[in-house]
Amino acid sequence: MTTVTVTTEIPPRDKMEDNSALYESTSAHIIEETEYVKKIRTTLQKIRTQMFKDEIRHDSTNHKLDAKHCGNLQQGSDSEMDPSCCSLDLLMKKIKGKDLQLLEMNKENEVLKIKLQASREAGAAALRNVAQRLFENYQTQSEEVRKKQEDSKQLLQVNKLEKEQKLKQHVENLNQVAEKLEEKHSQITELENLVQRMEKEKRTLLERKLSLENKLLQLKSSATYGKSCQDLQREISILQEQISHLQFVIHSQHQNLRSVIQEMEGLKNNLKEQDKRIENLREKVNILEAQNKELKTQVALSSETPRTKVSKAVSTSELKTEGVSPYLMLIRLRK
């Protein structure tokens, strides 16, 4: 009689659930046990087939010999019983014993398959729990990242609005400076024209004064023109006063012109500074716009709902246990 004892260790369910982080090792262990059970079943089938072949061949031979021997003895003495005739009953008992052993082996095999199914379901539950926790952690982290990105986006938007407001103010200041500069330029042009007219008038008065002085010299040489000389002297004095006053006005206008030119130079320098500030603000606004677009893209990607699947254990057993708990099946077999 051949006896095959199958021993396998099934990890406790509570330990597998507590060590869900080692689900990869559990899956490998389940697959290894599955392959081991398959090998055992194949071996048992081969043993059973071989045992039946040997027993049938041996029983057939013994049966023929016993039948022939019993026939010969029966002719000699019908009342006497040959002990070899009882070998058939013994053989039948052996066959029944083998059948019982095979039945026990099959039952053990079924128990192993049920335990394997229970272990596989426990591993699948552990995998689902781990996947669920990972998914929840991912959702939490994604929400935190999305919130940070939203805060950064709002902060960038506020900074952008502030920069745009400053840029607008600087542009207005620049326009005002440009208007003042244009006014100063017009004022300078008017002052230059006024000074030119005054210079021309001054030259005219000087020429008239010189002409009167020459005429006065000519009249002084003659004593008969005393009254005319006095009139000429009076006119020359008036011209001199006009020339002096005109010279004072021209000097004042030159000072005003220099002052306006200096103001214009200051406005030009201010205009250059405003241009630089506006250019810097435009660069900052462009940078903020680029960062804002990038954050919008990141927020859009983060807000998309990820599609996740919870992994399930793959069935590697031929045992059909749909709708029935493995533990209930194990209890039924033990009864």
Curated annotation (Swiss-Prot):
One of its GO terms (biological process) is microtubule anchoring at centrosome. Signal peptide: none annotated. The keyword Cytoplasm applies. It is found in: Cytoplasm, Cytoskeleton, Microtubule organizing center, Centrosome, Centriole. Interacts with CEP170. Expressed in bone marrow, colon, small intestine, spleen, testis, trachea and cutaneous T-cell lymphoma (CTCL). Residues 101-305 form a coiled coil. The gene is CCDC68. One of its GO terms (cellular component) is cytoplasm. Centriolar protein required for centriole subdistal appendage assembly and microtubule anchoring in interphase cells. Together with CCDC120, cooperate with subdistal appendage components ODF2, NIN and CEP170 for hierarchical subdistal appendage assembly. This is Coiled-coil domain-containing protein 68. Keywords: Coiled coil, Cytoplasm, Cytoskeleton. The lineage of its organism: Eukaryota, Metazoa, Chordata, Craniata, Vertebrata.
